Amino acid sequence: MPHKQINDLQAFGAHAPRGALARIIQAARRAPEGWAGRRAAYFLRALGVRALRGRPADVESLGARMRLYPADNVSEKRMLFTPQYFDPQELAYLGQRITADFVFVDVGANVGGYSLFVAARAGAAARILAIEPQPEVHERLVYNVRQNDFATVKTLECAAADCDGEVTMFLDSRNRGDSSIRIVPNHDGGRLTVRARRLADILAGEGLDRIDAMKLDCEGAEDLILEPFLRGAPRRLWPKVMIVEHMPDRWSMDLPGFIEAKGYRRKLRTKHNLIYERDGAESLR
């Protein structure tokens, strides 16, 4: 089994990039779009990961301070070295809709990329709920939230699912972001039991009365979460915008068809995600 990463909770700045590593990060972040730019950025990124030798790096990314561990999490690697390539279409779409009192629910929050992106652009009246079931990844999420002064992000350590109780999570130790409550192709990191709650129960417990946007990145468990939610939750809690990871090979139903039958329009398909907007969302506020 691959080496398990241990989180380092020292004060922010203890792992600030210096010297050659800092120059590699700067160069990778300046790489443009296009085939040649991406090839250069990915080459630099690989050099940087090797230079870190499993250590984290303290940087600003997506408008927030984060401690990122690129060795075992692809999302963290992207945010550290190439944030310009980190879901740019999704974040642009989301960014255009952020208001001072934005309500955002991040299901499968990982270490907080989306949640902190929203927090950096919303006002003090915003509410951001970041849900992450993996204990080690949740610990990184909490650390990153605490390095910023937003005071609008709340984290929950649980899995959103189709039941309340406990579920088995299958771990991919090479990419913590690929772990799932559905069996994953490379679950060489073993498995663990995590707390599970229905999404509707989570939101009710938080006292939310609306959701402006929700992101679901659950490595193939999106249907398990959304199907019971859209069947049973009050319509006032249906998100105006949904960003849903596109993993049809793992779903047990036609999730896009189900979502569209519930009154959502697909606005965009990107490399990894589907973006939906609820019919009439523009007039709901």
Describe the residue ranges of each PLM region.
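Phosphate/nucleotide-binding beta-alpha loop and adjacent structural elements of enzyme active sites
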Residues: 1-285
